[in-house]
Regions:
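Gly-rich Lys/Arg/Thr-decorated short loops/hinges at beta-loop-alpha junctions or inter-strand turns
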Residues: 134, 155-169, 290
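Conserved hydrophobic positions within beta-strands
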Residues: 79-81
Length: 440
């Protein structure tokens, strides 16, 4: 399958709308309250450790990991717990949340101090304690990722940031390069992985130059410039482009000898090792054609979307039509502006009513562009037919489970068909049928 990918898949050339690429992150005004979710990661929710009326500080642990595949949660503000209550997640499920009224002081918890790391066990314990997850959007537990059963020879840092509008990773590279290197060196030292490759798209020459400079005397770390084609940041594509390896069907990056970390994740790890401050804030890109002041904001975890948007403002005379959480290609539309930011929130895109207007959908003209530009070499046209017939075996032959909903097929479709949504439905149907043994 991936041999075909190497020969045929091109990937879409999305607009290089990076108006905030030079926008150095600045702290947003402190909100009156935050709502911190106990589920911000893949795996079991954390268990709330606080109750109404408790005083908390920046860095106070307010949620204990609820299992091996779970993450600690820390307060992003100082103040008083106003409530511990259920909250509906964007996927429809319920989880506990901790509502904190801020006191405006941002007092740091006295317990926050740099961890003592002397060996692999203490390193992994420190990573787990700080609540670090994949900050590129996946939210997988970093300490679990760093304990693969397979033999791994490469730490691969995903610094491609190919999503339209997003520049928070770019700013992390430009402003926190020492933290990035510190995090990488710690991973290599304590896990025994011999080398690291940092993959950066070639439309970020300043980042490539800076990280080359920072690692010039570090032979274990290589900076690799990648083609600026949308989809490069997907793990399977990144591994193929950086290492020339294929991940087996249904496998993990570790099956190809690699561990992949987002560049902001490894930078956050570097900061934690130096300061002891857990994951309590992150840089969020706020942009879009309805945004008055596109910028990168440093946002406390748990801040309501509407508070972040108000900090950037809406253009005068422009009607806000839609807000997208994450990048314009893969991010979901926001239903509720009171929804809180999480560790994995990388951007909020403000679209005008005109830009958000759904296009006129026309019949498929069988042009094949969705096939030509799929970065995974899939065939959305054929998948659509197989899904319409509920043909599980054919969906398997078409490798629908390789789809990662990048949006390329919808982006290039001249008929404006919702190809990505169809692929998502087909994949969910296929995986559900396989799980229960359907179409035998």
């Amino acid at each position: 399958m991936l041999n075909k990918l190497k020969r045929a898949a091109l990937g879409a050339h999305t607009p290089h709308d990076k108006a905030t690429a030079a926008s150095k992150p600045v702290p947003m005004p402190l909100p009156a309250q935050v709502r911190i979710l106990m589920s911000q990661h893949i795996g079991a929710p954390a268990k709330a450790l606080v109750k109404k009326g408790d005083e908390v500080f920046v860095g106070t642990k307010i949620g204990e990991a609820g299992g091996f595949v779970s993450a600690n949660i820390h307060s992003s503000v100082s103040g008083t717990v106003a409530a511990v209550e259920p909250f509906r997640l964007s996927n429809g499920r319920m989880c506990d949340s901790v509502v904190i009224k801020t006191d405006g002081k941002q007092t740091v918890d006295p317990a926050v101090k740099a961890p003592e790391v002397t060996d692999k066990a203490s390193f992994l314990a420190a990573v787990r304690e700080c609540g670090l997850v994949g900050l590129g959007g996946a939210g997988f537990l970093t300490d679990v990722k760093l304990q693969p059963k397979q033999t791994v020879d490469t730490l691969l840092i995903n610094a491609s940031e190919c999503e339209v509008w997003l520049t928070s990773d770019t700013q992390e590279m430009l402003n926190c390069s020492d933290d990035i290197v510190r995090g990488i060196e710690a991973v290599l030292k304590y896990t025994g992985i011999p080398k690291c490759v940092i993959g950066i798209e070639n439309n970020k020459p300043e980042c490539i130059e800076l990280l080359n400079q920072k690692t010039k005397d570090k032979p274990a770390i290589e900076v690799k410039a990648l083609p600026s084609v949308y989809g490069t940041g997907a793990e399977l594509i990144l591994i193929e482009k950086c290492l020339g390896r294929e991940v087996p069907h249904g496998g993990l990056p570790a099956d190809a000898g690699a561990i992949v970390m987002n560049v902001t994740s490894v930078s956050t790890l570097g900061k934690y090792l130096a300061t002891g401050m857990p994951v309590v804030e992150r840089t969020i890109t706020v942009d879009g054609d309805a945004c008055a002041k596109p910028q990168n904001l440093i946002v406390p975890v748990g801040t309501a979307y509407e508070d972040v948007l108000n900090a950037a403002g809406i253009k005068g005379g422009v009607e806000l039509g839609k807000v997208v959480a994450g990048g314009a290609m893969m991010g979901p539309a926001v239903e509720n502006l009171s929804y809180p930011t999480t560790k994995t929130t990388s951007g909020l895109i403000m679209l005008s009513a005109a830009a958000a207007e759904p296009p006129q959908v026309n019949p498929c003209i069988r042009c094949g562009r969705c096939v030509e530009y799929c970065p995974m070499g899939l065939e959305p046209v054929e998948v659509n037919q197989a899904y319409a017939a509920r043909d599980v075996q054919e969906l398997g032959k078409l490798h629908v489970d390789y789809c990662f909903n990048c949006g390329s097929c919808t982006f290039v479709c001249p008929a404006k068909r919702p190809c990505t949504q169809m692929m998502g439905l087909a994949k969910a149907f296929y995986l559900g049928e396989i799980k229960k043994g359907g179409n035998k």
